[in-house]
């Protein structure tokens, strides 16, 4: 028969109780789902977004649910605002951070010949540069916590062709950054992993759902025959932050209903 102490240790492996987390871009879509997932599992969460009105609406909802969430306005494409964000996080959490979810990002989808220099710079600054810089300036806080976990919200577009070359390049670079940091920071007890969603029901993918032919093409490409839901992504993010995932680092994991491994098959 298991002892009470052993049961307690087993439960703590599957809990975020007492942990602190920063989730960027948490006012909608995947970020909102991640904030709720982590808070529901016991973490104290700070999140940011560009839209203050939307952020305050979410905050009222989270407070009504009893979640411990604080917020601040931040455009992660701005280096100055990223530094201010981390100062705020350090103050809120007394210089220690267990979890960093680099979720904020943007997408510009167009033929490669039509991408402008401004498109390229904006995509790289928002998706890649911000993820690296936030990880870099969060490093002292993650190390101070004694056990840190970074999760990059990447995309299947970083692994296979999806018709968005520069967007895909920003996510592919993010995946490699995750592998590099995982190796470099393992000695500081900081784990780093990337999560790659396929088409998920969020505001970012609304253009797909408004086009019946495009939606059907996505579903046909996906072995499971449907698009994903935000909570199917946030559950993986939470798992990677659990103590139970303490030996998982440097991984790039798809949440895609099998889309990224699907080849071609003809069914007459």
Curated annotation (Swiss-Prot):
UniProtKB keywords: NADP, Oxidoreductase
EC number(s) given by UniProt: 1.1.1.-
Gene3D superfamilies, per database record: NAD(P)-binding Rossmann-like Domain (3.40.50.720)
Catalytic residues as annotated in Swiss-Prot or TrEMBL: 167 (proton acceptor)
Protein name: Tropinone reductase homolog At2g29150
Function: Enantiospecific reductase active on cyclic monoterpenes and small flexible lipophilic carbonyls. No activity with tropinone, nitrogen-containing tropinone analogs, tropine or pseudotropine as substrate.
UniProt organism field: Arabidopsis thaliana
Record GO cellular component, one term: peroxisome
Binding-site residues, substrate: 155
Family indicated by similarity: Belongs to the short-chain dehydrogenases/reductases (SDR) family. SDR65C subfamily.
Organism ancestry: Eukaryota, Viridiplantae, Streptophyta, Embryophyta, Tracheophyta
Enzyme class: oxidoreductase
Highest taxon of source: Eukaryota
Binding site for NADP(+): 22-46
InterPro entries in the cross-refs: NAD(P)-bd_dom_sf, Sc_DH/Rdtase_CS, SDR_fam, TR
Single GO molecular function: oxidoreductase activity
